[in-house]
């Protein structure tokens, strides 16, 4: 009895610590506002059996951090990873975490976003698993052709990868954040990874994006029968929240495009992201405090102006 009392007392002492360490579920991409520390990362979230989201921190606005998120699919025939991290050290941590889940090799890495914060560490995949296959869109394949890990397979529309007993759909739904964004969908588990097509609670990074096409691509992904939907930045919450937040991200992108059109029609100049009078008078309304607004707004306005003027790449 005395021993049981001591155990209970110890648990009661630990309880406040557990409460203090608990994540605060506020809708923000800022880990600090969620009550999280750098030491809380990287972290793995199981979405469905053998399907995971992996969150790691990277520098964001000055003095701040944001997550870069990957998808991990473990099958009886090996592992598929969608997106990597921004440097070899961070990707080595990702590989180590995967090795703790399964002794099976990583067979495929799908490059959903060609940008360095998702591909800069891809050499770590190759070092750990020399036979790994990198898959990308034709646009991203060309962009990464001179890299140390050039994609050898391209998806122009849709490809089904049969890995073990699992079917994995790699989808090219159109241009969005880049010219070659991909999504990965598991029809069996109903999990959809949208990479940088969906940045949870971040101001849209449009400097190399395609404003109206991005909205169209989001809508195509929203039409997919998915329980889980998550993206390449921000946090992964419960399924209902993630769907609601995808709609919120689409609404934000719509508002950014509308504000850019208003300023363009008013004759306010935005010659480049570094020379943009429009950003100083823009009204972002409820999106004023979304993460990275200060750094991303000039490029977003520039890109909306280019779309209006027919100057976007074909």
Regions found by a protein language model. Give the residues of each.
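Bacterial N-terminal signal peptides that target proteins for export
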Residues: 1-8
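Sec/Tat signal peptide C-region and signal peptidase I cleavage site
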Residues: 17-21
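Accessory terminal helices/loops
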Residues: 22-34, 223-225, 237-314
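Metallo-beta-lactamase
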Residues: 31, 41, 46, 78-80, 86-88, 137-255, ...
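Conserved beta-strand hairpin/beta-sheet module of binuclear metal-dependent hydrolase folds
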Residues: 46-97, 182-186, 190-194
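Active-site HxH/HxHxD metal-binding segment of metal-dependent hydrolases
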Residues: 92, 96-162
